[in-house]
Amino acid sequence: MKAISTLTLAMSVFLAGAAQGADEAVTMASLAMHAEAAPQWPRLEMSEDHHLQDGLDAKLENLGLASKAQRGRLAVTLVDVTVPDRPRVASVNAHQMMYAASLPKIAILLGAFQKAHDGEMEMDAETETLLTQMIRRSSNSAATTMLERVGYSYVADILRSDRYELYDEDMNGGLWVGKPYAKKAVWQRDPLYNLSHGATPFEVARFYFLRETGRLVDAKSCARMKEMLGDPAIKHKFVAGLNIHRPGSAIYRKSGTWSTYHADSAIVERDGRRYIAVAMANDPAGGRWLSELIVALDDLIFDPENIAHDRMADDHVRPMVPPPRPPAS
C-alpha cells in the first residue's frame, strides 16, 4: 500500500462534498496519470478488520446463511466508512463473480459522468433525467439509451482503466456491462465468466468507496451521483429491511434482480455512522435473505465494540485473502 502523503487534503475534499476549483481535464489517455497524481487513500484489500469479520461470520451463521455462502450461493462485502480514512472491511466470497442483473448500471452511471467530464458528451437535463431513472427506478430503456450514448467500449475501458480497476482479471473480475438492457445482441461478455451483466461484491464496494472519497470523476460528479442513488423507488431487499427495522436510515443504493439472482448494494447513513453493504445471492429466496441480512449488517456497524474500533491501532486490520485464480482461458 502506498504511503498516504496527502490524506489531509483529501479529507477536506471529502468533508466539503461540494464543488472544488477548476478540475484538471481528464481524458481516457490520462486516466492512469491522474490515478498516480491523486491523493492516496487506504486500499480496501488491505483493510480487513478481524473483529468485523468475526461478527459477519457469526451473523451469517445465526441467519442460517453460512452454508449458503459455503456453497457459493451468497457473497457479501461490508465496509465501515464512518471514519473514511480508516475503512474496515468484512466479507464472504468477496471476489466471487456473479450475474448481477441491473446492479452494474452503476458502471453506466460512472461512464456517463466521466465522458461528460472529458468533454465528449453533454450532461444536460435530459441526460440527468435518464440517469436518474436508470438508477432510482432501474429503467431498462433509460439504461440502454445511456449505454449506447456513452458507448460499450468506453464503459469497459473505464472499468478496466488503471485509475478505477473496477474490472480486473487478476482480481477475478468485477463490474461488467456487456449487453444492453433490452432484447438486443450481446456486445461482449466478461472475459472470465461469460456474463453479460456481472459483478463481484468487493469491486461494487470499491465503487461506493471511491464515490464516498470523491474519486469517481471529481467531487462535483460524486455529489451528483449520490443524489441519483438516493430516494430509491423500488422498496425491496436492503430498502425493505432497513425501512421496517431501522427507520430513519439514509439509503443510496442500486439493486438487481433476474430469475433466482438477487443483488443489492448501498451506502447507508444514520446517527453519525456510515457503511457500504453489498450482497449477491443465487437462490429463489435470495430477496428475503438480503432483507434480513442488511438488518444484521446494520447491527454490526452499530455494535458498541465495533464503534470502539473506529480509532484503534491498526493491529486489528490485515490484508484480505487474495481472490481465487481466474479460470483458464
State the predicted function of each range.
Residues D23-L60, R206-F207, E212-S329:
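Structured C-terminal helix/loop/strand segments within mature extracytoplasmic catalytic/sensor domains
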Residues G55-N93, E269:
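A short, well-structured edge-of-sheet supersecondary motif
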Residues G72-T82, A125-S139, R149-Y152, G174-W176, ...:
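Acidic helix-start/capping segments at beta-turn-to-alpha-helix junctions
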Residues M146-T213:
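Mid-domain, small-residue-enriched loop/turn segments at the edges of structured enzyme/sensor domains
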